[in-house]
Amino acid sequence: MNSNLRKKVTLAGLLVSIGIVYGDIGTSPLYVMKAIVNENGGIAHVSREYIVGSISLILWTITLLTTVKYVLIALKATNHGEGGIFSLYALVRKKAKWLVIPALVGGAALLADGTLTPAVTVTTAIEGLKNMKFGNDIPVPNQNSVIMITIVILLFLFSIQRMGTSIIGKTFGPIMLVWFTFLGLTGIMNLSHDWSLLEALNPLLAVKILFSPANKVGVLILGAVFLATTGAEALYSDVGHVGKGNIMGSWPYVFICLALNYLGQGVWILENPNYHAGATDFNPFFEALPSQWKFFAIILATLAAIIASQALITGSFTLVSEASGLKFLPRMKIIYPSTEQGQLFIPSINKMLCAATIGIVFLFRTSEHMEAAYGLAITVTMLMTTVLLFEYLSLRKVNLSLRLVFLLLFGAIETMFLISSLAKFLHGGYVTVIIAAFIGAIMYIWYFGNKIRDKREAENAYVRLDEFTTMLSNLSHDESIPLYATNLVYMAKVKYNKFIKRDMLYSILDKRPKRAHAYWFVTVNVTNEPFTAEYAVNTYGTKNVINVQLYLGFKQQQKVNVYLRQIVHDLIKDGTIESQPQEYTTTPGRDVGDFSFVIVNDVISPQTQLRSYEKFLVEARVWLQNLSSNPASWFGLDYADTVIERVPLILGNQRRQHITRIAPKKFEDIKKKLQAEGELKE
């Protein structure tokens, strides 16, 4: 979406926001009331008090968590227009070091939840086809058929990610607008049979049902109720695509349609107490519709489920990209399938999401079992977001009393939801917990492994680059040494614009002198601003030793090869460096020479002296680095002349062992002794 639509509240912006932002929360009516009925033992065991109280819980949960916390408060906590837990962390990370923990935990849980959402939404939609007659045939006679159709849809969905979503994305808005309108109209249709159910708007009934004997599971009902607001975190994450104004403008319509549908389903349940009595495999969302509407509803629900899944998949790509930029995750190969900002595709993440989602479908088989596991991870994310928002409010100088009210209110509500959702652990919630723990462990190892490495590196690991400029200039003009490259580029972190790792200069000067017309030391700095693309240079008074500081936003693609060619051209044009005319070229008048890029990779040295815990983290971090994408891909150097050199990483106090030469006479004595013992032959 272009920047104008993000900034302004327009009809187009409102429509796009409906298509992009509300997919997850908009498909919740497919399974929330079903889960609530099943919590109490089936439709034969629910009373009016239970249904009215449950709907009241749903409506006030959406009001407090989605409307108040996310729409009215969180949307103001944007980082240059971008939202989500990592953008929020980037805003507050300077306040306290410990804030990295809620960011890591919340981000890992959000990514884990992403494996379950496509599975549960698509499966629920397709289950509406089960046992439906088309003439004399029943195309989907059993759950196995549902599973196969679901798998085909999911495989298709994941397979088209590489192509980008710019074209199909344009249809999301109209389809979701039809979907929400359909939810509202069908809700009114059923609600018109019993307007008295509007008493569910009374918040006292929401509190009362938690302790009522009509509710057989007590506060554990919140585990099912929470499913109605799982999409609130996605709403915050997607603010960068459409702008907070368009979300605030479209949310009232979406909320009204959702509320009407939940109320309508409640009326139908109370009107049909003996419908499939004792059964738990029916869905009140579809059953509440006239029979002639069901096929249309299933098609529309399937499209809505696909859109919700698509939004979540692309959201996962964005989340991983941001995590990499903040050094929470290893660098991965990122593909930008369109020219639109924010359109990205991460092949490795796509494969893992696809495998996990399909695995979940095969593991749980029915939407009922998936619902039992759904929501546990996202409660953790919401709780972590509350902690970070509390710090953000402090950053904004909000009154301490108001901040404490915010923390205690939403912290208490979300803690209750978390406790109730823990009951789902043994019913499948363990799957997302395991996935979240796995992702969280990778993030922890990568982040703190980097921290330990930076902190414990030997003091002599860095040298002043400006002290070697004369030597590098002399090497550049020494024609007795073969020319290695016109431009020799090292992807090297230059600290404070002057300190560089000794390994870089060792590679140029000591291993085998590498002569080049210009030596480039490029540092990529990831900024808090999402789309920064700037650079600064320092030549140290020379024409051939250049320190380049690239400043790229955490959402910006790192095409170093492209950027550097532009920088060289700029510096030649303003006379900062000498022209590099090419005698042999397909481009007449070309004044920029060839490039050779060098990337130095670390290998743990046996001389490293660290505590066992620190050594484990650093070794695990190096292992993850070797498993992840080639660093050349990360820097956009796939098609450039790139050399990767391995150097020993020495951390902490160095353990130096001295070897002593044996005196000739002593060596002869040892030799004779070994010969006498038969261990050494003449």
Swiss-Prot record:
Any GO MF annotation of the entry: potassium ion transmembrane transporter activity
Enzymatic reactions: K(+)(in) + H(+)(in) = K(+)(out) + H(+)(out)
InterPro entries, per the entry: K+_transporter (IPR003855), K_trans_C (IPR053952), K_trans_N (IPR053951), Kup (IPR023051)
Localization per record: Cell membrane
Topology within the bilayer: Multi-pass membrane protein
Transmembrane parts of this sequence: 13-33, 55-75, 98-118, 138-158, 171-191, 217-237, 250-270, 295-315, 344-364, 375-395, 405-425, 428-448
Keyword field: Cell membrane, Ion transport, Membrane, Potassium, Potassium transport, Symport, Transmembrane, Transmembrane helix, Transport
A single GO cellular-component term on record: plasma membrane
Pfam families: K_trans, K_trans_C
Entry keyword annotation includes Cell membrane: yes
Purpose of the protein: Transport of potassium into the cell. Likely operates as a K(+):H(+) symporter.
Similarity comment: family membership: Belongs to the HAK/KUP transporter (TC 2.A.72) family.
Name of this protein: Probable potassium transport system protein Kup
Gene: kup
